[in-house]
């Protein structure tokens, strides 16, 4: 997601009000669905609810695809004859497409129209899902995952900016964002559960499951997503977009490849150097062009910077933990995919039941308090998992931390979204959405890559048992749990840092 700047942190909600570039006044305003002030959600029209539902399906699909494939990897490898190295790219291919193009997707949503970008990208996502489910070889399967990630990089910020431009800032928008992020959090959390259930039938259903949902979102979007004005009179900064996408793509690719190639190998070092050069060139260009893709002045706002940093730590810790948990339950305990799905069911249920209350809590306490509570719950959950052995008692050893993780993600993620986008002008809501989403996805990609390097077996652990014994194998996974706990605690520290009460930054 993406952002802009004058900061006014009001006492109850620590709101952000941003001063835009000097040419903002000449930009056309996006026409929202008619609303009566800050009317409560109960009085929203049928069209308003269907607009919200369409965007919620989109973001739930994005969340599902991030987490859903993990449980199916052993079955995919057995069916297609793939080794662990190839299996890793089924996961990382999606992350590469998603994490490297989110900012570009958010900006294009502003420039080309959110409705247009959403419908086109969602159509591509649907076709790629179908191709993945019908794939008979690894190349097509990995390619379809990459294309789905690229499509999701455009659907996610477009969907979120449709929320922020069609619901007025305040209780109305907080309510809509709470519902929206409930679907996002639930989609991500329920991805492992659905994958466990469907893998018992066939791994292909973990890919085909998205097709009917995507078609439903397309139909609703076509009829109920209003046409919005495009930003006119501003350059598209095509060179900047190319530099950013290329730099991010190479950076994520290098991080994902490093565990296999070696962190000190020539390809890895060269990849980091070239990626750094591309991103440095992007920053220099953005500081000089008249209409930049990103106005870096927004990072002078403490709340915006804090929201993006906590997004990195929250999502990174969660992705890392789910990866380790999948290996722990299947490789150490020998659980079936269905058994793992049932064990994780409380997480999804807690997310679904806690996230809807986030908007009320944000209105009362402000997003910062909710972020602190959320990251605190996640930290406690990860630390509790560190005491697990090879024969845990589910009700005593697994269920309590699972519930804490659901609470932490369910209230922490909506609060981060609100903090990062409040006060952003309509024509840059897509950018604001893209910046936070990019932070979250890049955090997840980096954490996953580091996790595979930290655990002794790495990706090779998928699909096989360590002959040295269950205890030794469990010890191999503990560094991944330490990483998750460390990231969550770092995010908690960032969220709790003292903040300035008022800061104004002039545009430019």
List PLM regions with ranges.
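Transmembrane-helix exit segments and adjacent C-terminal regions of multi-pass membrane proteins
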Residues: 4-51, 55-57, 418, 468-508
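Transmembrane-helix bundle of Major Facilitator Superfamily
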Residues: 20-223, 371, 376-379, 383-386, ...
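Interfacial helix-cap and linker-helix signal at transmembrane-aqueous boundaries
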Residues: 76-77, 108-109, 194-201, 255, ...
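Glycine/proline-centered helix-kink
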Residues: 157, 185-196, 248, 323, ...
């Amino acid at each position: 997601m993406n952002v802009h700047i004058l900061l006014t942190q009001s006492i109850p909600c620590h709101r952000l009000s941003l001063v835009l570039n000097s040419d903002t006044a000449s930009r056309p305003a996006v026409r929202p669905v008619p609303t009566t002030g800050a009317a409560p959600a109960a009085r929203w029209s049928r069209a308003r609810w269907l607009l919200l539902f369409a965007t919620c399906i989109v973001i739930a699909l994005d969340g599902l695809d991030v987490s859903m494939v993990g449980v199916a990897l052993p079955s995919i490898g057995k069916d297609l004859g793939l080794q662990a190295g190839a299996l890793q790219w089924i996961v990382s291919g999606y992350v590469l497409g998603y994490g490297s193009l989110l900012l570009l997707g958010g900006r294009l949503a502003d420039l080309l129209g959110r409705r247009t970008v959403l419908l086109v990208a969602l159509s591509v996502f649907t076709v790629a899902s179908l191709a993945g489910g019908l794939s008979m070889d690894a190349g097509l399967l990995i390619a379809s995952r990459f294309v789905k990630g690229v499509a999701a990089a455009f659907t996610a910020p477009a969907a979120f900016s449709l929320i922020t431009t069609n619901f007025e800032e305040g209780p109305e928008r907080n309510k809509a964002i709470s519902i929206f992020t409930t679907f996002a959090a639930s989609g991500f959390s329920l991805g492992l559960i659905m994958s466990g259930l469907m893998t018992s039938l066939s791994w292909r259903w973990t890919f085909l499951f998205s097709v009917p949902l995507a078609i439903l979102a397309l139909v609703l979007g076509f009829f109920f997503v209003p046409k919005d004005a495009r930003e006119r009179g501003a350059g598209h900064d095509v060179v900047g977009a190319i530099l950013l996408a290329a730099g991010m793509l190479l950076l994520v690719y290098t991080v994902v490849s490093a565990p296999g190639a070696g962190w000190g190998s020539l390809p890895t070092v060269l990849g980091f150097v070239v990626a750094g050069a591309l991103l440095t060139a992007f920053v220099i260009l953005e500081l000089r062009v008249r209409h930049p893709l990103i106005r870096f002045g927004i990072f002078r706002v403490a709340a915006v910077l804090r929201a993006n940093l906590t997004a990195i730590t929250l999502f990174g810790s969660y992705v890392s933990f789910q990866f380790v948990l999948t290996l722990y339950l299947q490789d150490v305990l020998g659980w079936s995919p269905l058994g793992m799905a049932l064990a994780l069911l409380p997480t999804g249920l807690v997310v679904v039941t806690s996230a809807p209350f986030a908007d009320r809590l944000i209105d009362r306490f402000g997003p910062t308090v909710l972020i602190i509570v959320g990251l605190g719950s996640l930290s406690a959950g990860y630390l509790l998992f560190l005491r697990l052995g090879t024969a845990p008692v589910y009700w005593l050893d697994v269920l309590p931390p699972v519930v804490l993780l659901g609470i932490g993600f369910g209230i922490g993620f909506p609060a981060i979204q609100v903090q990062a986008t409040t006060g952003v002008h309509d024509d840059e809501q897509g950018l604001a959405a893209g910046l936070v989403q990019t932070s979250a996805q890049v955090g997840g990609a980096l954490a996953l890559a580091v996790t595979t390097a930290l655990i002794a077996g790495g990706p090779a652990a998928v699909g096989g048992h360590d002959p040295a014994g269950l205890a030794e194998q469990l010890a191999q996974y503990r560094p991944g749990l330490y990483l998750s706990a460390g990231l969550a605690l770092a995010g908690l520290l960032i969220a709790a840092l003292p903040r300035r009460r008022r800061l104004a930054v002039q545009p430019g």
